[in-house]
A protein has these predicted regions:
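Bacterial N-terminal signal peptides that target proteins for export
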Residues: 1-7
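Glycine-rich phosphate/pyrophosphate-binding beta-alpha loops
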Residues: 326-337
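Beta-strand-loop-alpha-helix segment that lines the small-molecule cofactor/substrate pocket
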Residues: 138, 144-145, 149-197, 211
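Bacterial N-terminal signal peptides
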Residues: 8-16
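C-terminal helical cap and adjacent loop that interface with cofactors, partners, or active-site loops
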Residues: 22-42, 46-50, 55-56, 78-79, ...
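N-terminal Rossmann-like dinucleotide-binding module
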Residues: 19-113
């Protein structure tokens, strides 16, 4: 009997029938094709349609004035409208929300800035009429998650540039459609990832780009934010909607559904699709406890299935052998935390929960800062005096330009204003945007890829290549800048336009 069992096991191992998954192509509920290959889930990268070209480094003709239409004026949209009234050379042409009164309410920001009223659109499909206008250059989307894609698709199909709040796409199908629409129409499709513009992240990115940490080989990011005070405030579609759109989405979907705050800044530091690419991930989550309780509390019914775990962890390995860890937790009580940690061969940076840098004396000197203590080492964070000197030396040029005004205008401490200002700056100067459609797709696809991993025993899953082989075309992530002369010229035109627009509106109201 033992001999028979051993023979059977040997045959199984020889032919792989006991351990190998079927290699037939499978399709999940979102339409994604995938198959097993040596224990790894391989996700198909579709071929680029004929006549379509990459938009890496896409630069469009300069826009003296950026004419904007805003769609989605609930929690985040009004703040964006307000911020744009502070940016010279912009014109808020149209406002749109499902609920008309929300759009009308945002007229107050224009009035306070002495700017003319904007056209108002509302209803389920109001954004379609906005996108058809021929006097809009940019559609700024801040709706609930499920409307990000349809609004962006409509805008791109109507020849508009788009900027989309996070997460900008909810699955791979949407990611690929946005990539193809951007490439086909030669228009910008930017993810509005504000955390890439926070002070620590920008200064640390500048340090990394100047070799302060040596080669960055590992990075961490997260979105850990107990949303208990906010669940009741998310938009609800009618009286029958007891959960609100965000809790409902978490209930129905597994994976890191809000990865971009953590992933975006570290992806820039690791030069993703600028010399490296994310290749493989493995995801794991805890069971849902708080999520189920929230459904029971808000819907007054027992929740038997809550797909999103209370805490999700995703591990990613890149083509160049770097590792990224991303976490998501909006359920349990703990301090706000985006982690943001870079581990380099010669130094270390960490934002949450303790902010600081760790370098030894030799590396600090090599980075252009003279240590004040003789025995400085990397076993702990550097003293405050050295920290201040290091940050001062490597203060990011974008922070020097916009930092002080950003603190006055606000928006998550000012980073939202910096993000919007850079978007307008690049459009006015005909430059590539700081984040392109490939960033959008790479950062947003973690949700579905993580779901694939966890639904298949936490298996390894390959990333599709949204650049379709061009991830190594550019070496190193960089922000684009105009020359001083070009910058001064575009700013003069912007200020002149805004001044005349306000004067015309004041005269009209007299």
């Amino acid at each position: 009997m033992k001999i028979t069992n051993f023979l059977a096991l040997g045959i199984c191992l020889l032919f792989g029938s006991c351990t190998m998954q079927k290699s037939t192509v499978q399709v999940n509920d979102k339409g994604t094709e995938w198959e097993w290959n040596k224990g790894t889930i391989v996700v198909k990268t579709p071929e680029r349609p004929a006549g379509q070209e990459s938009v890496i480094g896409l630069a469009l003709p300069k826009m003296e004035v950026v004419r904007v239409g805003f769609v989605g004026l609930g929690m985040r949209g009004p703040g964006a409208v307000s911020r744009f009234t502070y940016i010279p050379g912009t014109q808020i042409v149209a406002l749109c929300d499902y609920e008309k009164e929300r759009a009308e309410k945002c007229q107050k920001y224009l009035k306070e800035a002495s700017l003319p009223k904007a056209a108002v659109y509302s209803g389920e499909k109001g954004y379609e009429e906005l996108c058809k206008r021929d006097d809009i250059d940019l559609v700024y989307i801040a709706t609930d998650w499920l409307h990000h894609f349809p609004v962006a698709k409509c805008a791109l199909e109507n020849g508009k540039n788009v900027a989309i709040e996070v997460p900008s796409a909810m699955n791979l199908k949407e990611c690929w459609e946005l990539v193809d629409l951007s490439e086909k129409n030669r228009k910008h499709c930017m993810i509005l990832e504000n955390c890439c513009y926070d002070w620590f992240e920008m200064n640390t990115l500048n340090m990394a780009q100047h070799g302060v940490f040596g080669e960055v080989i590992r990075a961490q990011g997260a979105y850990i934010h107990n949303l208990a005070p906010f669940w009741k405030h998310y938009w609800k579609k009618g009286e029958d909607d007891k959960l609100g759109w965000r809790l409902d989405y978490n209930m129905r979907h597994r994976g890191d559904v809000y990865a971009t705050h953590g992933l975006g800044p570290v992806a820039q530091a690791l030069n993703i699709h600028r010399g490296d690419r994310m290749e493989t991930l493995v995801a794991m989550d805890t069971k849902s406890v708080v999520g189920k309780d929230l459904v029971k509390e808000n819907a007054d019914s027992v929740c038997n299935s809550f797909r999103n775990g209370d805490h999700t962890t995703t591990l990613i390995r890149t083509a160049n052998g770097k590792v990224i860890e991303i976490q998501h937790n909006v359920m349990t009580p703990q301090p706000y935390n985006r982690l943001y940690q870079l581990t380099g061969t010669k130094g270390f940076a960490n934002k949450y929960p303790t902010q600081g840098y760790a370098l030894d004396a030799e590396q600090l000197k090599a980075s252009g800062v003279q240590p004040k203590v003789d025995d400085l080492n990397s076993h702990g964070f550097m003293p405050r005096e050295e920290l201040v000197a290091l940050v001062e030396k490597y203060q990011h040029p974008i922070l020097k330009k916009y930092g002080e005004m950003a603190k006055e205008v606000g928006g998550h401490g000012g980073m939202d204003f910096i993000m919007d200002s850079r978007l307008v700056y690049c459009l006015q100067n005909g430059l590539p945007l700081d984040m392109d459609v490939y960033d959008l797709a790479e950062w947003c696809c973690l949700a579905e890829l993580g779901e694939l991993s966890m639904d298949n025993g936490c298996a390894a899953v390959t990333f599709p290549d949204f650049t379709r082989g061009e991830w190594n075309k550019i070496q190193g992530y960089k922000h684009a800048y105009a020359t001083q002369e070009e910058e001064a010229n575009s700013m003069e035109k912007a200020k002149t336009f805004t001044k005349k627009l306000k004067e015309k509106n004041r005269n009209k109201l007299r």
